[in-house]
């Protein structure tokens, strides 16, 4: 009971700090769930309205605000199939207020701005210069707005005039983000409080998670905050692997498993248009087992892009900054996969056994360590409005903290160039998320460095299984510059950081030193297992080599 009271007092303290430093940018997440069930609007639009009308502890004010938001959505939200009905109403009444996605472009020939309405289907609607100057996101992909429209048809101007005019435009997404305000606001919170706020902002309840589980969920956010970051997460079903990329961020896209093309993903040579990697901050592939390229060179182009952030199509090379995320399900236990194949086994064969492709993965997130989500894992408390979270994360993509490692540590000799890049990008991502103000101690940096080394080592361990002694250097470490002591980082599922675990081996296990095919001496673990069968003795081999 005392522990429950303590949790509530900590929550109240965080809530008061949020109100003080981020007023109008926070929302109670259970209100989003209530209205979202009956309203087909993006979460970030809904939460912005709730943040405006329901930012109070008074239940009456909250209830009144919820009713106001429902009324605004019912009266003004434009459904694409009702566009003509809305236009007819506008013509009859002479004015009408709509909620729609507005994009503005500059017509250089006529030297003026014009607006396009996504659901209403209107294009080239004249708009005053003050709006794109004040709300620059109108020019960068568009934002959702409440717009008061006037309709006035003048017979004399029917050739050149436009009967629909914009009287007033009010954004219902964050029109612009001041990153300095965020950094200043962060100083009011401890590390633990800030992590809890970030998790509540994506809908999760941190009190139902262990400390390590919190960090694993934060790892999912690194592709949103880091350019050209490649993440893989394989794990059980119902752990929310794709939720963040589909529902929370308006800057990421989830490509469901199935066939895709180079034109769709990278560059369409017929239309001369850049594909998904040029339009989104993060491209996530759901159900990796089903990924298929219609083009023979698809995987090769993807490998090129994952390594360098650019790809060649036709006569020129194109660059993009989108991160790549691969999520999928593991159908067997991790122990079985480690014994019989690799942790990349769910990938299609052309990817899952291609060491050049897998070596480009910066991070392997152990999805099996994240719990299956139940109702108590979803928060009813305050967090950032989804749009505010997504936009400040997007702004942080421009910051760089990866060189912070060099202040206190040096990476060990077993890390090659790709390993170093992967670890630096991961550390950069963690620091941006948890310490956006750039203020952290040596111990806090060491914590994220250890996690980054573990995530990359998990990739390297599987490469060693698939590629043999080419990838023998998996004993990742870092050196403390103060006393020059070297610290090794292991992966939990491999059974600790020692080459041969201490104590008695498991039944059927023995360790031996011998020469491999390349002539290099290594330590081998031999296992014998017994299954029901016909008494025949079979060798399963080492990794993919059944004859070993």
Model-derived regions: residue spans:
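Extended, charged/polar low-complexity intrinsically disordered regions
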Residues: 2-201
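Conserved NTP phosphate-binding and transfer environment spanning the P-loop NTPase/kinase superfamily
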Residues: 52, 362-492
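P-loop NTPase catalytic core of nucleic-acid-dependent motor ATPases
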Residues: 173-251
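Post-Walker A helix-loop "phosphate-sensing" segment adjacent to the P-loop in P-loop NTPases
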Residues: 227, 250-260, 310
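Structural recognition of the conserved hydrophobic beta-strand(s) that form the central parallel beta-sheet
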Residues: 233, 284-286, 320-340, 363-364
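Conserved nucleotide-sensing/catalytic segment adjacent to the nucleotide-binding pocket
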Residues: 268-316
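Conserved Walker
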Residues: 269-273, 307-322, 338, 346-354
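Conserved P-loop NTPase/AAA+ ATPase motor core
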Residues: 491-548
């Amino acid at each position: 009971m005392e522990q429950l009271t303590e949790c509530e007092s900590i929550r109240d303290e965080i809530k008061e700090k949020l109100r003080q430093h981020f007023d109008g940018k926070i929302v109670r997440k259970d209100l989003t769930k209530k209205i979202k069930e009956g309203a087909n609007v993006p979460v970030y639009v809904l939460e912005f309205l709730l943040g405006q009308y329901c930012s109070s502890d008074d239940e009456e004010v909250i209830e009144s605000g919820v009713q106001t938001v429902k009324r605004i959505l019912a009266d003004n939200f434009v459904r694409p199939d009702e566009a003509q009905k809305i236009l007819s109403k506008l013509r009859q009444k002479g004015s009408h207020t709509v909620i729609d996605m507005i994009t503005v472009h500059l017509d250089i020939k006529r030297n003026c701005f014009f607006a396009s309405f996504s659901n209403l289907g209107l294009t080239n609607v004249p708009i005053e210069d003050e709006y794109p100057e004040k709300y620059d996101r109108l020019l960068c992909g568009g934002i959702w707005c409440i717009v008061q429209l006037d309709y006035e048809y003048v017979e004399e101007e029917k050739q050149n005039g436009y009967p629909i005019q914009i009287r007033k435009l009010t954004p219902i997404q964050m029109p612009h983000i001041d990153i300095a305000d965020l950094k200043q606001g962060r100083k009011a919170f401890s590390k633990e409080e800030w992590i809890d706020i970030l998790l509540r902002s994506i809908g999760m309840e941190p009190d139902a998670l262990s400390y390590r589980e919190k960090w694993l969920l934060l790892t999912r956010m690194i592709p949103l905050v880091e350019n050209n970051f490649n993440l893989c997460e394989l794990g059980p079903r119902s752990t929310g692997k794709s939720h963040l990329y589909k529902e929370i961020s308006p800057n990421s896209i989830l490509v469901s498993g199935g066939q895709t093309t180079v034109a769709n993903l990278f560059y369409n040579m017929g239309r001369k248009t850049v594909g998904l990697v040029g339009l989104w901050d993060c491209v996530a592939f759901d159900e990796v087992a089903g990924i298929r390229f219609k083009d023979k060179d698809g995987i090769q182009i993807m490998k090129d892009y994952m390594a360098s952030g650019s790809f060649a199509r036709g006569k020129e090379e194109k660059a993009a900054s989108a991160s790549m995320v691969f999520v999928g399900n593991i159908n067997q236990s991790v122990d079985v996969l480690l014994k019989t194949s690799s942790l990349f086994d769910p990938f299609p064969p052309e990817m899952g056994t291609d060491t050049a492709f897998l070596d480009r993965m910066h991070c392997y997130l152990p999805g099996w360590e994240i719990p299956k989500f139940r109702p108590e894992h979803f928060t009813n408390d305050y967090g950032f409005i989804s749009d505010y979270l997504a936009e400040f994360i997007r702004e942080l993509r421009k910051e760089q903290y990866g060189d912070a490692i060099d202040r206190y540590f040096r990476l060990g000799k077993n890390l090659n160039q790709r390993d170093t890049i992967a670890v630096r990008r991961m550390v950069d991502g963690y620091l941006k998320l948890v310490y956006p103000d750039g203020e952290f101690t040596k111990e806090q940096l060491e914590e994220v460095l250890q996690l980054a080394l573990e995530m990359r080592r998990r990739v390297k361990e599987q490469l060693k299984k698939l590629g043999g002694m080419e990838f023998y250097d998996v004993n990742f470490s870092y050196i403390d510059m103060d006393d020059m002591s070297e610290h090794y980082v292991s992966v939990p599922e491999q059974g600790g950081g020692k080459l041969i675990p201490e104590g008695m081996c498991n039944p059927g296990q023995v360790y031996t030193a011998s020469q491999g095919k390349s002539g290099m001496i290594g330590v081998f673990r031999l296992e014998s297992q017994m299954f029901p069968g016909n008494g025949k003795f079979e060798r399963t081999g080492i990794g993919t080599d059944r004859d070993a």
